[in-house]
Amino acid sequence: MARAIMFQGTGSDVGKSVLVAGLCRVARNRGLKVRPFKPQNMSNNAAVSDDGGEIGRAQWLQALACGVPSSVHMNPVLLKPQTDMGSQLIVQGQVRGEARGRYYQELKPQLMAAVMESFAKVGDGADLVLVEGAGSPAEINLRAGDIANMGFATHADVPVVLVGDIDRGGVIASLVGTHTILPQEDRAMVRGFLINKFRGDISLFDDSLAAITRFTGWRSFGVVPWLKAVSRLPAEDSVVLERAVRGDKKALIVAVPMLPRIANFDDLDPLKAEPAVEVVMVPPGSSLPADAGLVVLPGTKSTIADLLALRENGWDRELVAHVKRGGHVLGICGGFQMLGRRISDPAGIEGNVRDIEGLGLLDIETMTEPEKVVRNVEAVSLLHDEPLEGYEIHIGRTSGPDMARPFARIGDHDDGAVSPDGRIMGTYLHGVFSADRFRHHFLRALGVEGGQMNYRESVEEALGELAEGLEASLDIDGLFALA
């Protein structure tokens, strides 16, 4: 089995995903055959892997950093929250049903076999596997049957490095507290720690590093400064969206309602990277900006529930006002379904609401179906006759008069719909704005001269800068020697 190192955090959103992506690129730059692995992920920000299943978007990015095709085995267990009490369970890329609270806790030991099978497949032929944990290993209420953190590490005998986030404060207490809470068997798996997201003079933290080592016995592998390259990489968690603030006025304002179960929000990243575009994430309780030229209704894990939430916030009325002012609207996947006259869910796939009136901005209707469409696609934009590469992850079939004006052509069938005046658009395709020529033409049609940015190259450049920053700030030789 390949050598491996596992990175666990003192909590969620400490930066594990990006750190692992950066370290994957570091290892690749050093000539190692490196692979990413995350036993269990909880995220609605999913990707379609190169072998045709669903994985966390973070593992897709990590595979890119490794320079290898993504695989369902890089993230064998994916939980996609769809209600407050339950998540859709994806095992090795395929839907296995719904996981609810206590039932899932009882199911986890059975999933360890799939996790270990995938871990072996990922490690086959690799020099190094970099493993990412989930949340915190100190959640002792979740330790029994754990497959995400120490349960996996002890089962697979993989050494652990703890990651602490100093930007949120309390990093010393987080690390020392984790040491205190962990049972002896788990504590013995930890070989050291690193500090992430430091701002200012790092030398001022030297005494604190020594104190953490004194309290825990763990060595420090370094302090990672706040790296600007991180902001140019796709974020995994919607919590990052909540921190977005408006900047200087740009030529085009793109407003995005923050739906409770927003999914695949990295669709927006190429727009955010355009110098003339400002993407405004609109939180619940706030109004859509009146100066927006485009409103994007994003993907969602629960279309009907999020449509109800959209109405509760008054965004439906604001959308109508936006259209009357001459604004444009783009619905992606679940957002596309919302734009129609009606959504029917006769089998109750999404919940108890079996039929709901849509926003009525497109003359279409959607019927949910049990079979889930999961695939990477090559398409042609029928708006601008430009090639597109994207992916579909959805349930439901949409039909209606406005489908006669499709958004794109995928092989032998059409996708999406466009209103007669061309200002309301919908598509099932995720990732369309990553296509540079399409994005530039799309923005030009909205009165904005798009730049010459190559989005994929910009992501590669950001990964390169991230790797350089980690090489400069961490004891990479010491880290890799753990495996």
UniProtKB/Swiss-Prot annotation:
Keywords recorded for this protein, A-Z? Cobalamin biosynthesis, Glutamine amidotransferase
Kindly give the InterPro entries that the UniProt entry links to this protein: Class_I_gatase-like, CobQ/CobB/MinD/ParA_Nub-bd_dom, CobQ_GATase1, CobQ_N, CobQ_synth, GATase_3, P-loop_NTPase
Q: Would I find NAD among this entry's keywords?
A: no
**One of the GO biological process terms:** cobalamin biosynthetic process
Q: Which residues form the active site?
A: 333 (nucleophile), 430
Does this entry carry the keyword Cell inner membrane?
Answer: no
* Entry's Gene Ontology molecular function annotations: ABC-type vitamin B12 transporter activity; catalytic activity
Q: Which residues form the GATase cobBQ-type domain?
A: 251-438
Q: In which pathway does it act?
A: Cofactor biosynthesis; adenosylcobalamin biosynthesis
Q: What function does the entry list? A: Catalyzes amidations at positions B, D, E, and G on adenosylcobyrinic A,C-diamide. NH(2) groups are provided by glutamine, and one molecule of ATP is hydrogenolyzed for each amidation.
Q: Which PANTHER family match?
A: COBYRIC ACID SYNTHASE, DETHIOBIOTIN SYNTHETASE
Family under the similarity heading: Belongs to the CobB/CobQ family. CobQ subfamily.
- Give the protein's recorded name: Cobyric acid synthase
User: What is the native source organism of this protein?
Assistant: Brucella melitensis biotype 2 (strain ATCC 23457)
Lineage at the top is: Bacteria, Pseudomonadati, Pseudomonadota, Alphaproteobacteria, Hyphomicrobiales
